[in-house]
Amino acid sequence: MVQLCLLRHGESLWNKENRFTGWVDVPLTDFGREQAEKAGESIKKEGLQFQVAYTSVLNRAIETLEIVMKTIQQNIPMIKDSALNERMYGDLQGLNKEDTAKKYGNQQVHIWRRSYDIKPPNGESLEDTQKRTIPFFMNCIMTDLKEGKNVLVVAHGNSLRSIVMYLDKLSKEQVLSLELPTSLPIIYNLAPDGKVIAKKELRL
C-alpha cells in the first residue's frame, strides 16, 4: 500500500480579500502560514513519510509546501509544475466575489466557480483544468505511487478538485458540491495498481 496526500495551500491574501485569484501569484497571509504549519503537524502526528512532493509554480502553494516540509522534518525532492496551477479565472481574476455575484447573480457565479464544463469569460473550466492536471497526475504522480513512493501534493482548490474528481470517480453533477478547505490534508491509501483503498481527512 502507498499513500497520497493532497493539500490545498493556506489562506492567501486574495482568499482573505474574497477575490478570484487564478494564476495571479499572490502570497500567503500570516494566518495561511499558521494553517500550513498546523497541516504539517497533522501529517506528522499521523506518522506519514513521503519520498517526493509535487506543487505548482505559484508561490502560495510553494510556500505552503516548504512550511509543511519544515514542520514534518522531511527533506524530500520538490517538483514544481504549472500543470498543478490553479484554474485560470480569466476576466474574473482580481475581482471581488461578492461584487461579481451582485453584478452577474449568485447562480451564474456559482456555475462559473463550481460547474465542470462552463468557463468564466476568457478563463478555464474545471474540464480544461483537468485536461492538464490528470495527464500530469498519471504520468508523474501515479508513476511514483506505483513505484512504491508516498507522495505529497500541495496545490490549489480547483487543480485538486479535478484530481479528487478523478480519484473518487465523481460525476459532473457531484463535483458541483465538492469544496476543498485550505490546508486540510486529504490522505488516500492506494493499492500497488493505483486503485483507491481508503480515504480520510486529517482534521486537528
Question: Model regions: which residues?
Answer:
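Phosphate-coordination/substrate-recognition cap region in phosphate-metabolizing enzymes
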Residues: 38-110, 165-181, 186-189, 196
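Short, well-ordered beta-to-alpha junction loops that form the rim of enzyme active sites
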Residues: 55-58, 83, 114, 149-150, ...
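Loop-to-helix element that buttresses phosphate recognition and phosphoryl-transfer chemistry
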Residues: 5, 11-63, 103, 120-135, ...
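Short, solvent-exposed aromatic-acidic interface loops
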Residues: 200-204
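Extended, charge-rich low-complexity interaction segments
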Residues: 107-123
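Residue-level preference for the first positions of well-ordered beta-strands
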Residues: 4, 148-154, 185
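GST superfamily/GST-like fold recognition
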Residues: 157-162, 197
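Glycine-rich phosphate-binding loop signature in dinucleotide/nucleotide-binding domains
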Residues: 46-49, 143-149
